[in-house]
Amino acid sequence: MIIRTLRSQLRLPKPVYISPPCRYYSTDLEKLKKESDTTESDNSASATGVIDKTHNEVLLYYDHIYPFTTSRNVVKQYLSRFSLPWSTAYDDEKLKQKVWDLSSPLETTAKITEFVPLRRDCGAFVKFKYPPEVPATKFIEEIRENVEKNEQERVNSNILTKLYHQIWRNVPKVYSVKGTPWIEDLRRFPSPKLSVKFEGDPLTEEELYVLFRRYGLINEIEPGATEAFIYFHSTRAAISAKHCITGMVLNGGKTTLHIQFVAIKRSNFLVSLISNHTKIAIPVLIALLATFAVLIFDPIREWFIEYKILHNRKSFDQFKESRWFKYLYIPYRTITGWVYSSYDYIDSQIQEVTGSSCSEEDDSSNGSNIVDGQSVRDLKNESNMFWIERYEKSKQLQLWIMENANTFIIVKGPQGSGKEEFVLEHSLGSDERLNKKVLVLECDQLGKARSDNNLINTTASQLGYFPVFTWTNTVSRFVDLGVQGLTGQKSGLSESKETQIKNMFSLATQAIRKITTNEYNKYVKSVERRNKRLKDDEKIEVLKEEQFLQQHPEAKPIIVLNKYSRRADVSSNDFIPPLVADWASGLVQNNTAHVIFLTADVGSLQLLNDALPNQVFKDISLSDASMSSSRQYVCDVLKVKDTSTLDECLEPLGGRMLDLQSFIRRIKSGESPQQAINEMISQAAELINTFFLNSHHKFGAGDSNWDPSQVWLIMKLLSECDTINYSELVKSPLFKVSKETLEILTTLEKYDLISLKRDKGVLDKISTGRPLFKAAFANIISDLRIWKLYETEYIGRLISLEAAKIQKLEEELEKIYKIGKVDGRIDYVSQKIEASNKKILDLEKQAADVASYTGKPDGKSFLGIKF
């Protein structure tokens, strides 16, 4: 009974029975249109937003006649505003015909007088003209029945449409428009929440429910004095309600409804909790950014690392093996061969007729191809000749790699001994199986980086790590500082350079592993293809990946770590050598790659021992070339046949390649051999004076601070003989058997002053590090002024050591006297003091002799050591 009363109250009254004081929303719009459109010819709904309706016309709303349904998806809402490429079949005329087909059959006099599509809302307003003798309610009910019947027939036409209907139920529906619709194209996208504003008396919650329930399920109604909110279960129902009821006049013209969509602001409890607490939000944001970086950029960087490894040694000779190059090059070579053959034939015929010879012209033309007195072909031949002595070592290196058993190889040798050329050109470059997957890392460049960004860029360049964003380090530091000021704790956004470098090497490990996995996959596919053509009893067994890598060493990349040292040139980068050693040992232990270390620093072997304990390294020691090879090399480059003038000059250079090349350049620049060698010896002597004998020299980070007197003693001993026994050297008061002495000698070896030779791991002999330094030692000692300076300093250092010893003995003697009754110890200490005092007297006499000496120094001895 109550519902009937509400329905009777909400029934739209006919305008003819409205008393004059009552106000109609539609009448107001008509008046506004007449007043504003006096000069306009276009009064359609698209121009005014209002649909005019006359007698015998009904206005209906068809929902869901477009393919895109409006939903809570924001992207789909925006797409509904545009004409998509595949929506050309849904133009206005075709949609109008679709609506007519859905509504048919109708009376013959019925027709569509106006069609207003709403692309955004996926519906359309359709104005029908119906016969006068047919009631409007009956006409509308007939259209609804026809739409339902026609759509049901279409759904049942095949199983696909039926299944689609069961899942989505996107069947068009027809609603009668009760109000005055406002057709707008504002950016007010459909929403299941409607705002109902009352112009006049408000409606109760029950009245709103009766009015809106026919369009769909309602979740909630929030009534108000001037505005009410209705929450529909679906957006489709809200769209239909908004278009059919807005502008509706109720209660005898006392109430007019204005309806609009209201965007629903949904709040997630978890998101709100995180966003409202900075201590939680910032770490979560950082984690999301890190995840994004890993998912997006790490695969790209991994690909670039793979590309660098696979194409690092790509030469023109390898490029010529490409079949595409052969397709182009072979025809070109054939045509040029025909041309040159024709030219040679014509030239030979001319020579037979004229009797002339082109030998002199050929000689002159060949001379034009010589660069600095040497042709390119000669350079190649001479280089091969120079490396004949190391041929066996090169074969040994290749054999170790092909054996594929603990391929952790160390190539040792002094600076300038050609370690890099030996490995890359003569060992790996000469074998087609080994030169296809090579990664070369210049460790010295990593150690020389002065700033964090420079270090990261250098490491990325060495590994092929791209892209790299160094600017994020600066930004992250500022953000971290600001967050620490706000929250009292660090955000963790900024990473230390150690962590960043470690992550880069970890990604390189993944890239290397992927290369080996790809090689294994190729092997598996090839075996499977062969097995398809074989019988079951003849099929080949597919090896496991570890077995495959063990039997195919060429499938693993070769990592060459050039110029490896135990310490970096910049102290802040000292973490790099152990990091590289651990990374390389991991590659070998996981059977992922072959690793070759090239080092001139013998002390770096300790780091490698720590990184790969319980393993015996395979090492190759490269020494200087022999005298005969050096002589032949220089003579071939300089085109000299008489070696008598060079023998004396080449002897100080030994077989050090860098010094030989420097000697050749000096001679080519116009110096005589004697001038060239004298100048090189003078420069080496100046280097020794400045760097090793200068007490004010600034030492590198981690280097043991040697004493100039220690260097002076070693120089005097090595100037007279080729090697020094370590057991004899430690007899000097300046050296003693201790860890400090070994560190000093190792540091001197690092800077190439000396070379240490070990026997079964124990230091045995000491020799000159660079052959040219031996002549430089003699040059310094032969200079009387320099000799007197350093000899006096050397003797003074010995005197100070003896004086310190006497002072220590005197302190002990004083303590003994207080104890008493230890006459034996007193006599022993007294004799020690007397012996040291006698040494001081002898040293002071030697110092006086040195100061008064005016000629060449004679050979003297101290403690049986010649100097």
From Swiss-Prot:
Recorded topology in the membrane: Single-pass membrane protein
GO molecular function: RNA binding
Source domain of life: Eukaryota
Mitochondrial matrix side: 26-279
A single GO BP: mitochondrial genome maintenance
GO cellular component terms, A-Z: mitochondrial inner membrane
One family name in Pfam for this protein: RNA12
Principal location class: mitochondrion
UniProt topological domain (Mitochondrial intermembrane) ranges: 301-867
Segments forming a coiled coil: 795-852
The organelle targeting sequence, given as a residue range: 1-25
TM region(s), chain numbering: 280-300
Domain RRM: 179-264
Keywords (A to Z) from UniProt: Coiled coil, Membrane, Mitochondrion, Mitochondrion inner membrane, mRNA processing, RNA-binding, Transit peptide, Transmembrane, Transmembrane helix
Localization in the cell: Mitochondrion inner membrane
Family under the similarity heading: Belongs to the YME2 family.
Function: Plays a role in maintaining the mitochondrial genome and in controlling the mtDNA escape. Involved in the regulation of mtDNA nucleotide structure and number. May have a dispensable role in early maturation of pre-rRNA.
Identification of the protein by name: Mitochondrial escape protein 2
The organism of origin for this protein: Candida albicans (strain SC5314 / ATCC MYA-2876) (Yeast)
